């Protein structure tokens, strides 16, 4: 265990017996998280039922060194990377305004993703998702207020998750939104996202309402 005090780099000193070869796994996570069981870095267990949706609070990093042979005063540079795929779901700001007229105020609602077939275990030494595939739903939290511009249109972020998927795996993504007292709720299928380590996959559309234009003309003739 080593605290970085918020820094992005830290020095770790280990006392290793000379003349031997070592494979070493590294894992970094925020303090206070209980959704990761790191008793075995080659089989880190992820309990998604303890993971809060929509945030970077549970973001983690891993790294590895293979066949390290020690000599006096060795210094080894290790870069830690993110094992997750980040999935974002956005809808147009016009859609947000339209759905608010139906009584859905997104500023007072919570959201979470439901994803199917993702991994529940991670091998930090080899950087591989492992374990059985599981269908999971994270703990709902406040809908983000982030606004993004994509191809000239503005979109609001509805949900954002860090997902551990198997290599190049297509994942079905559903989004659930609910009010504090659960009197108002919405759910929809957002689409398929690709699970690739260290990559962000963005799903964007108009998910709540459709804009329909009627071309109306008056036929004044009377037969």
Can you say where each PLM-predicted feature lies in the sequence?
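Tryptophan-paired
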Residues: 1-38, 96-195, 214-223
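Phox homology (PX) phosphoinositide-binding domain
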Residues: 196-210
